Amino acid sequence: MGIHPLTSRCAGRTALVTGSSRGLGKAIAQRLAAEGATVALTGRTMDPDPKYQGSLRETLAEIEATGGSAIAVQADLSHTEDRERLFAEVVDRIGTPDILVNNAAVTFLRPLADFPERRVRLMMEMHVLAPLHLTQLSIPAMRERRRGWVLNVTSVGGDLPGGPPFDDFDRNAGFGVYGTVKAALNRLTKSLAAELYDDGIAVNAAAPSQPVATPGAGTLDLAKTDTEDIELITQTALELCTGDPATLTGRIAHTQPFLREIGWLS
């Protein structure tokens, strides 16, 4: 995470960030905590494990070492019961979230002709149903406060590809199901933003304009593509999780053009 001036933009607020043991979720959780939020971390990896890069305990320790406030709750968000248990524990320990960041994901890349149905269902569960369910659980308290922010972490892979002619990536990379679930998440974001607008709840999505070199990017050959600094997604997330819900909602924000639009990036 880069060095940021402390502005306390999230002081007094609580945030739930899914998939925060590593990668984008970890970086977003750290940024919100640095801005004063009390952050609930969640993911499947609670303790350090040599099979994985990062764990909830490590993220928690790093936040607390810099003076931030956080808790860690292990959960497998592919299961309805785990989502409900997670949310209940977060409410019990730090209160209902003012900010919900739906970042947890699972990715399999394979041609559609032989893509296993069980993996399609798992990706739909993680990328679409889990964000919807956690948002549904968050809505009552946000409505009562007439204030709330929901951020769905999406991907430029959710954009419709051009063609014909189709480029080599779209023909051969096996991104069909991934792009489908991210496109569905984008549509869900727009619909939630419209339905919750009168309640003062902002719902947005954010995507890196280019791949970010994190442990979660292991399926990509980053040596063959341009990458961007993780600070761009953390800044985008901060803006979308603190902006005025009357004007900053319903956005599918790609980091670089969005940050140029608001004057943060030249």
Task: State the predicted function of each range.
Residues 135-136, 190:
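A short, exposed helix-loop element centered on a Lys and neighboring polar residues
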Residues 35-58:
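Conserved glycine-rich Rossmann-like NAD(P)H-binding loop of the short-chain dehydrogenase/reductase
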Residues 14, 21-22, 45:
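Conserved glycine-rich cofactor-binding loop
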Residues 183, 198-199, 205-206, 222-266:
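C-terminal helical subdomain
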Residues 111-112, 119-121:
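Substrate-binding pocket helix/loop in short-chain dehydrogenase/reductase
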Residues 151-184, 189-198, 210-212:
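Catalytic loop of short-chain dehydrogenase/reductase
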Residues 32, 96, 150, 186, ...:
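Conserved Rossmann-fold SDR core element
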